Amino acid sequence: FNDSYDGWWGHATLPKLNYEESPELYQYILGIAKKWVSAPFGADGWRLDVAADLGRSAGMNHQFWRDFRAAVKEANPEAVMIAEHYGSPYDWLKGDQWDTVMNYDAFMEPLSWFLTGMEKHSDEENPALFGDGCAFFEAMRYHMSEMPTASVQCAMNELSNHDHSRFMTRTNRRVGRLASAGAKAAEEGISYGIFRQGVVMQMTWPGAPTIYYGDEAGVCGWTDPDSRRTYPWGGENLELIEFHRYMSGIRKRCPAFRNGSLKALAAGDGYIAYGRFQSAQRAGGACCGVTAVNTGDDWLTLKIP
């Protein structure tokens, strides 16, 4: 830690830039924002790391992101701004700052608790939340209510990423990290069935399914740095890759899974069911899709209303 200048959370290797007192810096960063979404580079947008931590005050933070958005959208109106954020993003999603977020609170975390009973770092197990369909829907409703519909529909829905344990490892329902458990333990006791359930939900829940490289090939790993293992060239799980291809195809063929409204249809101990619905007035015409997930070991019969 560092006590001679302001670092992000005190880390000397991550100095915080002084936007408040440096107009030149401020404009320089806005120029970078415009450059990479413009020709000839044509980036599709920006992923903004811990975006709420920028600046020294909330007022400065919000003003910077308003100006950043204006610069980006002027250069490329179709460019997207996705913020990494923990907690409610409500104050940033009013149409003048971020477009959406990496969807930890309204996708990754509730899904992980429901399907595995594990927190997204594999640091904590809560058996009471494993398979609790009612708790899953309650968490989703609460966190989705903090975002406008447009932001929900394009939120970055991940099962894993570089900062958290691989979802495949969470299916072993074991608390651990690289230093305490070792790399091999991340690959032991995993469940391909539970993993496939996660993929099904990722491809049918509102938002933008975002596959962290290697998830589709069966890569395991505890939280950072173990979750950043190299892609297993030549050793991919081809059946899992094909399953991702199959579920992506279902999402592509059913417009309701991409753009439709959401309705919880059933929930209880060990199961959920939800529907996605689209009216005839939308592109692709009227359609609907129903997803049912059973976390138990026995067959289950549901009456879908």
Name the predicted role of every residue range.
Residues L30-S57, L159:
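Active-site groove signature of glycoside hydrolases
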Residues Y142, Y231-A267:
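Aromatic- and carboxylate-lined catalytic core of secreted/periplasmic carbohydrate-active enzymes
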Residues A256-C287:
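Surface beta-strand/loop "capping" patches
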Residues N61-W65, L240:
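Amphipathic alpha-helical segments in well-structured domains
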Residues F1-F41, F68-E74, D91, S112:
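Substrate-binding/active-site clefts of carbohydrate-active enzymes
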Residues P305:
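Solvent-exposed beta-hairpin/edge-strand motifs
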Residues G10-Y26, D49-M60, H121-C134, F167, ...:
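The substrate-binding groove and active-site-proximal loops of carbohydrate-active enzymes
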Residues A33, W65, R69-A70, E78-D224, ...:
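Conserved alpha/beta catalytic core and glycan-binding cleft of carbohydrate-active enzymes
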